[in-house]
């Protein structure tokens, strides 16, 4: 089996989210029509064109790789490598003209995500990482700079970011999340990938998310670990496939896991 070119994978992930960003920005705040998928989640031409842009970049670099896309489903390919794609995380906000949305792209090789990227297009920010290559932030005004999580060691000094409030502020999550939120310095709910970006850039210490799909989380583990943080599901398993997650600076991870233990068990 050929060895994976990890540097090419990293460059491809970065180019893919940059291409998707351009495709989506062409429709941003222009009154796009919103359709509903069978699961009642929204989709627009921006989602579809962003996924097409990502697939074009991926196939040009790795034509034999499999792909799992939120909008187009599974595309067969080499068994050892699969790209996981969310072309526009935060579609609801996008349709309302909010700025905190963006694409997520990850490469899973032999069962482990080894490279990934995400972007906040309105801010002109691109985040990218590969195993052993570090995590980086590129902006429209500066060369790529290394990412590093915060060094805040005490929960009373921490900032907590929350994901989907309709899940996290409802039973069974509401009680433990409220205890965490009232014991830290401040709590914010920026939504979608933006809350995670706060942890990745050292502006928050923890981000909790639940009720999501693998493509909503796929690149985050490698991004955060390469920035010195820790990423697990709410049961403490280092995976992006459980549908929930805790992303942290590492220093406070076990504290948050312990608080969430009553709701972290699985059938």
Sequence positions of predicted segments:
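N-terminal subdomain of lithium-sensitive/metallo-dependent phosphomonoesterases centered on the IMPase/IPPase/PAP
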Residues: 1-88, 252-258, 265-267
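Residue-level signal for inorganic ion chemistry
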Residues: 20, 24-27, 47, 58, ...
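Short secondary-structure boundary/capping segments
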Residues: 33-35, 59, 74-76, 118, ...
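Generic detector of well-ordered alpha-helical packing
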Residues: 48, 52, 71, 87-90, ...
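DPxDG-like acidic metal-binding loop motif
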Residues: 77-136
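Short loop segments at secondary-structure junctions
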Residues: 108-112, 122, 131-134, 140-141, ...
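An extended, acidic
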Residues: 148-267
């Amino acid at each position: 089996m050929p060895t994976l070119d990890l540097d090419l994978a990293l460059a491809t992930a970065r180019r893919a989210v940059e291409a998707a960003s351009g495709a989506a920005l062409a429709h941003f705040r222009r009154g796009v029509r919103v359709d509903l998928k069978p699961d009642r989640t929204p989709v627009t031409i921006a989602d579809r064109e962003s996924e097409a842009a990502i697939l074009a970049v991926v196939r040009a670099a790795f034509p034999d790789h499999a792909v799992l896309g939120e909008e187009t489903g599974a595309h067969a390919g080499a068994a050892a490598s699969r790209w996981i794609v969310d072309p526009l995380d935060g579609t609801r906000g996008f349709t309302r003209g909010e700025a905190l949305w963006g694409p997520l792209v990850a490469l899973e090789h032999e069962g482990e995500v080894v490279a990934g990227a995400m972007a906040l297009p309105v801010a002109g920010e691109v985040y990218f990482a590969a195993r052993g290559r570090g995590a980086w932030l590129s902006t429209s005004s500066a060369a790529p700079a290394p990412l590093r999580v915060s060094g805040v060691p005490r929960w009373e000094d921490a900032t907590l970011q929350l994901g989907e409030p309709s899940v996290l502020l409802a039973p069974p999550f509401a009680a433990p999340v409220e205890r965490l939120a009232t014991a830290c310095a401040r709590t914010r709910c920026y939504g979608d990938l933006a809350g995670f970006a706060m942890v990745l850039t050292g502006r928050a210490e923890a981000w909790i998310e639940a009720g999501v799909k693998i493509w909503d989380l796929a690149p985050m583990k490698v991004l955060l670990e390469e920035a010195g943080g820790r990423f697990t599901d709410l049961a403490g398993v280092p995976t992006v496939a459980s549908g929930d997650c805790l992303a942290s600076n590492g220093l406070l991870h076990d504290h948050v896991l312990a608080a969430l233990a009553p709701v972290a068990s699985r059938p």
